[in-house]
Amino acid sequence: MQKSERVNFGSKIGAVLAAAGSAVGLGNIWRFPYETGNHGGAAFILVYLACVFMLGMPIMIAEFTVGRHSKASTGRAYKVLAPGTHWKWLGYLGVLAGFLILGYYSVVAGWTLEYILEAGMNGFADKKPEDFVVAFQSFSKDPVRPLIWLVIFLLATHFVIVKGVKDGIEKSSKVLMPVLFVLIVVLVGCSLSLPNAEKGLEFLLKPDFSKVNGDVFLGAMGQAFFSLSLGMGCLSTYASYFGKETKLGNTALSVGVIDTFVAVLAGLIIFPAAFSVGIQPDAGPSLIFITLPNVFQQAFSGVPILAYIFSVMFYVLLALAALTSTISLHEVVTAFLHEEFNLTRGRAARLVTFGCIIIGVISSLSLGVMQKYTLFDKGLFDLLDFVTAKIMLPLGGLLVCIFVGWYLKRSVSYEELTNGGKLKAGLFNLYIFLLRYVAPVAIILIFIKELGLI
């Protein structure tokens, strides 16, 4: 595909919101607040921000550079920039990672739809804490209901993708992201109005530098890496739709700020509500689907209508956060098939959706009726999570650093960062230093930590 034929995002704000939508996901809500509250509050946030700017942004800019300069999807970008070399496998790695993640991530995304329905039917009312445990375990192991929601969620994602870059991805981002922001701000306001909310606020934001140690730095580095959707090709694919006027540095900064802003606000929803009823939240799916429904019912027990509204809004928020992520993951694979095999966009999208439904169905069933079928003592859901999050993404991020930092000509990076010399790049040498030396070491440490070796 020639550069002149490639569709670009129609506006700068559309590009920023699309990239931010790729970064904002369920991890912002179920992992970041827990990490922050248990690792020094504001002290962790400061360490995390340092990691975002010293680790996350250099890699993000590197991925943006690859995407815009090649004007190709992640799967083809490295063939364009390094023809006749083995670097093409880095592009294929990103496509495969995106495909596998979309397959099992859509299972969890589908759960949010079940909980929107459950909340909307007032199904959380009058339940005891143990009832939420039983309800979630029963639902997640059900051989039918999760599959229905999985298919619905993937079809919603498919609908956006087949509309194309401008009419699908950009338009949806301009709607979904503002709605997400409004929902999260309203929910924060409700949560902070609860009795004893200040205890949760203190737990989340009061700096405790005595807790800052090596583990905290590793946790902050890992959170920054995974939260910003690095290493999976989403950002470089979106960057291939950036216009020449898009400022890569400013866009990366905007994405980092928005992603962190959403994560902190998620904490301001969860902790004040939880502490108002004397519950200390955990992390992961159990936080979202077991702990929080119980918290919301108890926190607003005096005004049941508020418990109802709060619960519905919260799960709509989760679904929107998941959808912006599944759209970007789907686009990585669809764009590759569209360009590499000259398929129509619609046919490429159908292949991706169908393939992910198959992966999603098996992943979902591996939590229930097929849980006895394992590989390396893991069902498919847990195996895909392990292989992608702990191996493929860190490896992809590391190779991006090496490719842009060492293989690609510095003049290419300079040209992209300065928009052909039109912008100043006073921090260019620092960017190259971080990309060549700091980010690779950090990723190797993340890789080792995720594998449980340190």
Model-derived segments and spans:
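Membrane-interface "cap" regions at the ends of multi-pass membrane proteins
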Residues: 1-30, 59-64, 68-81, 85-92, ...
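Membrane-embedded translocation segments of transport machinery
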Residues: 2-5, 9, 170, 174-323, ...
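Inter-helical loop and helix-membrane interface segments of multi-pass membrane transporters/permeases
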Residues: 3-7, 35-39, 69-93, 106-162, ...
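Loop-to-transmembrane helix boundary motifs in multi-pass membrane proteins
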Residues: 8, 13-14, 22, 147-148, ...
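Select transmembrane alpha-helical segments in multipass membrane proteins
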Residues: 8-19, 44-47, 86-99, 148-153, ...
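Transmembrane helix-boundary motif of multi-pass solute transporters/channels
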Residues: 11-51, 199, 239, 250-253, ...
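Extracellular loop-to-transmembrane helix junctions
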Residues: 36-62, 145-146, 392-396
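A generic transmembrane alpha-helix motif of multi-pass inner-membrane proteins
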Residues: 379-402, 424-454
